[in-house]
UniProtKB/Swiss-Prot annotation:
Sequence positions bearing N-acetylalanine: 2
Main location: mitochondrion
Sequence similarity: Belongs to the short-chain dehydrogenases/reductases (SDR) family. 17-beta-HSD 3 subfamily.
Assembly information from the UniProt record: Interacts with STYXL1.
Name the UniProt record assigns to this protein: Inactive hydroxysteroid dehydrogenase-like protein 1
Amino acid sequence: MAAVDSFYLLYREIARSCNCYMEALALVGAWYTARKSITVICDFYSLVRLHFIPRLGSRPDLIKQYGRWAVISGATDGIGKAYAEELASHGLNVILISQEEEKLQAAAKHIADTYRVETLVLVADFSRGREIYAPIREALRDRDIGILVNDVGAFYPYPQYFSQVPEDTLWDIVNVNIAAASLMVHIVLPGMVERKKGAIVTVSSGSCCKPTPQLAAFSASKAYLDHFSRALQYEYASKGIFVQSLIPFYVTSSGAAPASFLHRCPWLAPSPRVYAQHAVSTLGISKRTTGYWSHSIQFLFAQYMPEWLWVWGANLLNRSLRKEALSCQA
């Protein structure tokens, strides 16, 4: 009995001496909970402010805000084509750049007939490197280029381990994903600075958030575009230029990997047209955005999750996409 009493007294003494530490831990816990709660509330507010409120008001006058002409690279498919149509619906004349002349002419005719704007097509294969930029520079000379959309991109045929990626694909990723955006900005930026207005939108990818296995070179090239755009914004915001890094996740376009389960989830992977409508509404508002509300939710999860969990999920998804692509080829 004496031993029990002694243990009880010892326990009370230890508990009394630890009270101050327990109170401190409680304060730390309360501070952490409050901080996370405020972060979640701010993220939710940002989501609503960026993706829903702008679409409730009148459409902005993009011509007055930026200029009369828009240049879109990669304009024959997917996001690029849809973005060109959305800008044309705002009354901007559009210059479409791609390597497929027949599809370019068809897209230009459709836009001109539908939206009653001027169109110009430039046939350019960005994978050929430096030689293609002189004709582009000459064609854009003395035009009021208000918006540049860098959407042209090279992708793996399907997710692959790096050693299995063809060497030509790696060169395409360097020339098309990295060099094309850099050189196109270099061509149009001086005119924008002279006019003290303009917008540059560079399409990155959700895979740039963290290292993405089975898309190693592609995700690294998109990380370059993200950092490039953010740095340009710091350099040229004071000169009236708005630079946006656009970070989409999956969109149901022909250029993306064939993922039928994503096609069955339009809220998760919207069509290019729906995506472009939302993305254009963020122009002039957000310097770095996914462009679509459900993609912003995915981006928040990606930002908060540990890297090992991202890698695990990426491996799981990309294995599934590779398996589906290979089964389609069989």
